[in-house]
């Protein structure tokens, strides 16, 4: 370990920081075809990969507490990085509850069913309808239909948000067929509306999008489509509009009314929050609401602490996280990202805690306000880098964490040229971080939270807009004032690791103890040591 005092290595009287750069969506895939990372100009990352200790780690499936072969995502990735252990994710918790028939034992749903039986109100089921597993899962919706039938709720309206981002761009009809089968099997349910996630799941306060979803759910004067849901999709595709951008469409007269109940079955909070805020907060001011139905609302998980809703699956509390350890040792830390990824380096990395820790400073850089990020592939990366360089060179932060959103957000558009530009932008920014960290004698650790931009087209020839299950890189650039002792002449990063090993690695670089609760293992080892057959820790 370092001979410095508890995490505060200094360079000319200033703290030499440990910097964690998370390249969101930067996965590893050897094949060049349809790979925006391998085909982009990346002189900095290429040079670092060849000159410094590096490895590949797992960022999907069991390595992050998800089912095998389930792609990782930003929420899960940042939670796992911050926890230093594998956490059983909400997808797994809820799926197990549905599969074992225990959904009807959930207190929030029991209470909702009882109130709706008394009031004779309609049960509305709202959420992303796909098997992407990032924000929701169609099996959970099917489970809700069977629960509603068993609970004696016969007035059930389905408001389906179409995906096309974590799934193929024109796959909604497949999910419609599954839902129609579930409606027939359960004997309850009516398709009431369709809406692309572009409108219903914004997270950047683009209220002009959210209001479109709000109105199709609440406005009694909305026109009702004269054609079937399948025909709505076909017409949308014919106009060049894919699932993500599907225009909000009313399919029946089953809109939200006073006394109705609502279950929002998305389990990931960040893209569900705005719509639920608009439906529940009495002092909401994002846009004028012509209709404000009084609803009895249950959300699958906690989207925000102050929402007037019941929560079906409350969060499991976590302690001894990376940020907490740094804070408890009296060290200062800096977290920065642009709007699209700001909750991930703060809220999610801190285990769902919204308030900053003692000594934790946060800096938000606004993302450009464009319809899709292929129109601005550089996003706000340069401004973000400038703010991070200032934090690094301030000499007051022991730990600096920055997230670059470009590979993920531009990768989601499926536009190859734009993704290549995004990758090259991030590569250039890493060069600036490297110079700044080096001037301070600090250490730079580079990794990613999941894959995305390394695959831009699927085998069917359609644009690939989803995440991947590919591993992600880790590169360690050791600083002069952060040299680790006890490793002979040199160090290497072991193979066989996962995202849960990032926090233990950072704590070692900071010369801080790893809590027992962190089952992850440091990636650092001496070159002369045999590579351990590291096992991924099991979910807690």
Swiss-Prot record:
Mn(2+) 1 binds at residues 408, 412, 467. InterPro entries: Alkaline_phosphatase_core_sf, BPG-indep_PGM_N, Metalloenzyme, PGAM_B_sf, Pgm_bpd_ind. Keywords: Glycolysis, Isomerase, Manganese, Metal-binding. Pfam families: iPGM_N, Metalloenzyme. Its cofactor is Mn(2+). GO terms for biological process: glucose catabolic process; glycolytic process. This is 2,3-bisphosphoglycerate-independent phosphoglycerate mutase.
């Amino acid at each position: 370990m370092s001979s410095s005092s508890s995490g505060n290595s200094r360079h000319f009287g200033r703290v030499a920081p440990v910097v964690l750069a998370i390249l969101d969506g930067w996965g590893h895939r050897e094949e060049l075809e349809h790979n925006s990372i391998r085909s982009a100009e990346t002189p900095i990352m290429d040079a670092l990969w060849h000159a410094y200790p590096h490895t590949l780690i797992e960022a999907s499936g069991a390595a992050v507490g998800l089912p095998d072969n389930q792609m990782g995502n930003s929420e899960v990735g940042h939670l796992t990085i911050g926890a230093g252990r594998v956490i059983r994710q909400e997808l797994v918790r809820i799926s197990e509850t549905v599969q074992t028939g225990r959904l009807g034992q959930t207190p929030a749903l029991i209470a909702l069913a009882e109130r709706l039986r008394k009031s004779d109100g309609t049960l509305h089921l709202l959420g992303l309808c796909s098997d992407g597993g990032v924000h929701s899962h169609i099996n959970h919706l099917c489970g809700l239909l069977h629960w509603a039938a068993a609970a004696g709720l016969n007035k059930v309206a389905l408001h389906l948000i179409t995906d096309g981002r974590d799934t193929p761009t024109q796959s909604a009809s497949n999910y419609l067929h599954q839902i129609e089968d579930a409606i027939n099997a359960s004997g309850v349910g009516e398709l009431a509306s369709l809406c692309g996630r572009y409108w219903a799941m914004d997270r950047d306060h683009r209220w002009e999008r959210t209001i479109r979803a709000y109105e199709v759910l609440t406005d009694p004067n909305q026109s009702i489509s004269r054609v079937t849901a399948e025909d709505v999709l076909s017409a949308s595709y014919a106009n060049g509009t894919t699932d993500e951008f599907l225009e909000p469409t009313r399919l029946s007269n089953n809109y939200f009314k006073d006394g109705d109940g609502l279950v929002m079955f998305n389990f990931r909070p960040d893209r569900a929050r705005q719509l639920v805020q608009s439906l529940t907060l009495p002092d909401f001011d994002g846009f004028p609401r012509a209709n404000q139905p009084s609803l009895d609302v249950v959300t699958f998980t906690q989207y925000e602490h102050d929402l007037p809703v019941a929560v079906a699956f409350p969060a499991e509390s976590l302690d001894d996280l990376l940020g907490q350890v740094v804070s408890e040792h009296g060290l200062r830390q800096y977290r920065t990202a642009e709007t699209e990824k700001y909750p991930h380096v703060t809220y999610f990395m801190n285990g769902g805690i919204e308030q900053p820790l003692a000594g934790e400073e946060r800096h938000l850089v606004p993302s450009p306000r464009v319809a899709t990020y292929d129109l601005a592939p550089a996003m706000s990366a340069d401004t973000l880098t400038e703010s991070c360089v200032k934090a690094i060179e301030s000499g007051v932060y022991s730990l600096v964490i920055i997230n670059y959103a470009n590979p993920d957000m531009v990768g989601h558009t499926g536009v190859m040229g734009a993704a290549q530009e995004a990758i090259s932008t991030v590569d250039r920014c890493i060069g600036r971080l490297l110079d700044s960290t080096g001037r301070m004698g600090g250490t730079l650790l580079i990794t990613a939270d999941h894959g995305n931009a390394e695959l831009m087209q699927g085998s069917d020839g359609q644009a690939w807009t989803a995440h991947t299950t590919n591993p992600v890189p880790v590169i360690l650039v050791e600083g002069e004032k952060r040299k680790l002792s006890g490793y002979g002449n040199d160090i290497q990063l072991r193979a066989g690791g996962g995202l849960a090993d990032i926090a233990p690695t950072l704590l070692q670089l900071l010369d801080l103890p790893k809590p027992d609760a962190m089952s992850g293992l440091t990636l650092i080892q001496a070159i002369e040591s045999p590579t351990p057959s590291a096992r991924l820790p099991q979910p807690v």
